[in-house]
Every structure is written in structure tokens, then in C-alpha cells.
């Protein structure tokens, strides 16, 4: 980009997608926090702070979107398993609707952007037939 003072856009998904992503993953199958941490990273949210993920899970539980229960194992320490509750399913439906609307807008935006780039690339790059003729001596 140029040296202007405009801040360059950040790549990846915004942090506020963490809650929606956690609900999606828990809706697919009950899961432990560590498993969710790995799955979130694989979906493109980038490196997620484990503390932030567990805080989000606790808030979602407090808000009645998920429930948790302890799963005891003879092979290791007890682990908390998270499950989606009906309010979490409603919230997930609402997010899906909002994301569909965002997808529609982004498709329009990117289509228009592609047309600009296409137009500018043909304006700035001379076609081979328009190359200047070599100078000849008289």
C-alpha cells in the first residue's frame, strides 16, 4: 500500500466470531475445551488465546447457551464437556442468518471490486499491439 496514514485492513475473521464458531462446533458434537481450541484454529480464526476461549465458554454457559458436565477418566484428569442448549441453537440460527446477509453483501462487494481491478488492469497495462514502435534511423 502507499505511505498514507490509512490503517491497513486486518486479514482473517474478526474476534467476535469466536462465540458463533464455538456454538457451531459444540452443535456438531459435544466437546472439551482443548478440542474446541484446536478446531477453532483449524477453521481460520487464527491463534486463539486459550484463556479467552475458556472465558467465552463460561460466559456462554452463564448465558444459558451451552451446558457443561465433568467427564471423569481413569486415564487422566476430569475434563469438562460442553453441549448446546436450546437457547444456544436459537443463537446459532440468528448468527447463520446474519452471516448469510454478510455473505450476500460480501459477494456484491467483491464482484464490484473485481470489476474495478479488471478495468484498472486494462487501463494501466498496454496491450502488446500498442507497444511503441522502435525508432528507425532515416
Predicted regions span which residues?
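Short, hydrophobic-biased segments on the C-terminal half of alpha helices
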Residues: 54-61
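Amphipathic alpha-helical dimerization/coiled-coil segments
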Residues: 90-138
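Basic, amphipathic "hinge/linker" alpha-helix immediately C-terminal to the N-terminal HTH DNA-binding motif
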Residues: 74, 78-96
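Glycine-centered, phosphate/nucleic-acid-interacting loop/turn motifs that mediate DNA/RNA or nucleotide
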Residues: 64
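N-terminal helix-turn-helix DNA-binding core of bacterial DNA-binding proteins
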Residues: 10-54
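Short beta-strand "wing" residues that participate in macromolecule-binding interfaces
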Residues: 68
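Intrinsically disordered, low-complexity serine/threonine- and proline-rich regulatory segments
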Residues: 1-21, 25-28, 78, 95-105
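Short, solvent-exposed loop/turn elements at beta->coil junctions and helix N-caps
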Residues: 9, 71-72
